[in-house]
A protein has these predicted regions:
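DPxDG-like acidic metal-binding loop motif
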Residues: 93-119, 123, 135
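Glycine-rich beta-strand-to-loop/alpha-helix junction loops that act as flexible
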Residues: 97-98, 239-244
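Conserved, helical-rich catalytic subdomain that frames metal- and/or nucleotide-binding sites
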Residues: 49, 138, 143-236, 251-264, ...
């Protein structure tokens, strides 16, 4: 069985607290975008793993392998699997590629073995792999809260067009959170942005990301990319997640295509895409 594992952007991210166990409370608007990996899993006589990216190995650090192990232990699955991962979403990008792959693995094994799960059980399994996995599993525009397990779908009024621009250097999510200063970082108004998306109002000036503050310290290329996008005429420019991808977003397809044309010789990874509204 084959599934697409769609990337996401954080249209805004507010990290407002830290718990005693070190985990952070957040509110975020997350949008799935038309950019994806493909994951194929089939029951096999022996475990096999193939990936078109040599650095994504068959280890416990691989989110797909981790998800399969969790499901095998939880549901006493004794089968072996042939796994083929066609990886397109860059790593250390803030686009949720690894968590999207894990969510796809859950959907596939759930279907193959006809596993019955409540929403609560799905979210519990997802959170064992990563905070973004519950969002990736449902794959709809949403306001996400708590540690990532609280998901409220948002009916987007409009389709938005997006240019992704990623420096070749990445950002460690762990290091970004370690350097996060809640008194100095941005705290965007997430409920206000949610209202604008539902009503179709202009979203100019409503975007923000708490993790830009530490990410800028870890990777100055992110600052440079933001400046270049703004110089090219982009109005809504933001880093996604913990970076290092920066995006600009607009309702006007041609506006984003024009900016893409101006950025084509920048030397960065560039991709034009759009939101998935359903």
């Amino acid at each position: 069985m084959k599934q697409r594992a769609y990337a996401k952007i954080n249209l805004s991210l507010d990290i407002y607290g830290v718990r005693e166990n070190g985990y952070h409370d957040l509110n975020s608007i997350m949008l799935p975008i038309d950019f994806y990996d493909e994951l194929e899993i089939a029951v096999s006589e022996k475990d096999e793993y193939q990936c078109n990216r040599h650095y994504i190995r068959n280890t416990e650090e691989n989110s797909v392998i981790k998800m399969i192990r969790i499901l095998k232990e939880r549901y006493s699955l004794e089968d072996q699997y042939r796994i083929v991962l066609n990886k397109q979403i860059p790593t250390q990008a803030g686009l949720g590629g690894g968590t999207a792959d894990a969510a796809a693995a859950l959907r596939i094994l759930k279907a193959i073995h006809d596993l019955e799960m409540t929403d609560e059980q799905i979210r519990d399994i997802c959170m064992q792999v990563g905070a973004d996995v519950p969002f990736n599993y449902y794959n709809v525009p949403a306001m996400v809260g708590g540690l990532g397990e609280q998901i409220e779908a948002i009916p987007l009024k409009k389709t938005y067009y997006i240019l992704l621009v990623k420096p070749w250097s990445g950002v460690s999510t762990k290091q970004a959170y370690e350097l996060l200063d809640l008194d100095k970082c941005d705290h965007p108004d997430i409920p206000r942005l949610r209202e604008a998306l539902i009503s179709g109002e202009n979203i100019d000036g409503l975007l923000g990301n708490s993790l830009e503050q530490p990410a800028f310290l870890l990777n100055s290329d992110i600052v440079t990319v933001k400046e270049k996008l703004k110089a090219a005429g982009a109005r809504n420019v933001l880093m996604s997640g913990s970076g290092s991808t920066v995006f600009c977003i607009a309702e006007d397809r041609e506006e984003i295509r024009r900016i893409a044309q101006e950025m084509k010789d920048s030397g960065y990874y560039i991709r034009f895409t759009r939101t998935l509204n359903q």
